[in-house]
UniProtKB/Swiss-Prot annotation:
Sequence similarity: Belongs to the DEAD box helicase family.
InterPro entries per record: DEAD/DEAH_box_helicase_dom, Helicase_ATP-bd, Helicase_C-like, P-loop_NTPase, RNA_helicase_DEAD_Q_motif
Start and end residues of each Helicase ATP-binding domain: 131-301
Documented EC number(s): 3.6.4.13
Protein name: ATP-dependent RNA helicase DDX25
Lineage: Eukaryota, Metazoa, Chordata, Craniata, Vertebrata
This protein's encoding gene: Ddx25
Amino acid sequence: MASLLWGGDAGAAESERLNSHFSNLVHPRKNLRGIRSTTVPNIDGSLNTEDDDDDEDDVVDLAANSLLNKLIRQSLIESSHRVEVLQKDPSSPLYSVKTFEELRLKEELLKGIYAMGFNRPSKIQEMALPMMLAHPPQNLIAQSQSGTGKTAAFVLAMLSRVNALELFPQCLCLAPTYELALQTGRVVERMGKFCVDVEVMYAIRGNRIPRGTEVTKQIIIGTPGTVLDWCFKRKLIDLTKIRVFVLDEADVMIDTQGFSDQSIRIQRALPSECQMLLFSATFEDSVWQFAERIIPDPNVIKLRKEELTLNNIRQYYVLCENRKGKYQALCNIYGGITIGQAIIFCQTRRNAKWLTVEMMQDGHQVSLLSGELTVEQRASIIQRFRDGKEKVLITTNVCARGIDVKQVTIVVNFDLPVNQSEEPDYETYLHRIGRTGRFGKKGLAFNMIEVDKLPLLMKIQDHFNSNIKQLDPEDMDEIEKIEY
């Protein structure tokens, strides 16, 4: 296949440019004026006021988080979830595979898989691939987290059913954003590098194709609105010829205005023999209702919920008078115990920016991660943190889930997570302090609490039936006795 995406030297140069750009932000006392260009606090420590949203909670963008996890994922994750399979025909045999050779793939596809670095199927792929590659084709609804090989699985299904000699769209994949569509296309490019004459085309914003143009690419990847336009208005895609229909990131789709209705309209124009595959990271009721409307007679793969635990995390709280008191307590803790790497969570961008400047001016190597940064910038910052170039990551809720750094030993809640009703956000608390104590290790969590917020912390303690011990930040002997 011809090169379909940016990458190679250009991609490396862009990564280096981003790293260089953010070195202004993460090195103490080095070119602090560089902060201003990224809307971090001004040189004198005062805060920029151009962005009125800084006082608002930093809202998590599901699509951006999904893309971020794809960008920073370095290898496949072996999920600890138990896989549950519900077959449309319970009496039919259930197959799983341990090697790609068992799937009897075309030689060029096997070469592409191994060239990507896959040695054997992941846990999800073991169960999903026999269903996705079956003859006759079977429909599938699958729950799969980022990093488990889900994209590679449905790309393999598309490439397996494409006829390179037929020059018209045969496979259609819907993604919720332009960037996620490009990420999927990159997987098609890499896996299909040995598939001669198989090509992909992007039905995404900005890719204007004149009405009446004959589309000869076999695989179309796009966002629902543009695909709908290409199919019904511009008549570029004949949906009656589509053999494989993939709907990726369904939970993000239904979170985006109009996408679910557009996707259903596209699906209804597909032939009955078209194979339909839907993937979602979560299976809440709204996702299930959408999946059942759009995928007829499916096999279902679900992940039994992993119980996040706080048992291996020691939790403390410190009573403080104000923001400066919190910072002084943080400094005392920082000076009294050995820290590998730490993540500090703030509820608002304003507090995150203020804390970044305070720590930088005191000589700490810190980086700042918030929702105003692009996904690529966030990925660069996380990679630097993962590489140990900074020891402290200050962030809002954009980092509460899905980002695993083995060296993180301490999590600090500079602000308690609360919902719009100013009640404790229990799930966010769980995922925040879950950034430590991972991979079977013990961890520490510190909560900086103003007196009027203490009832919220007590609700959190009762909710999780856990012990959150009060810590005196002035008692250095007590701090130094803290063990992981």
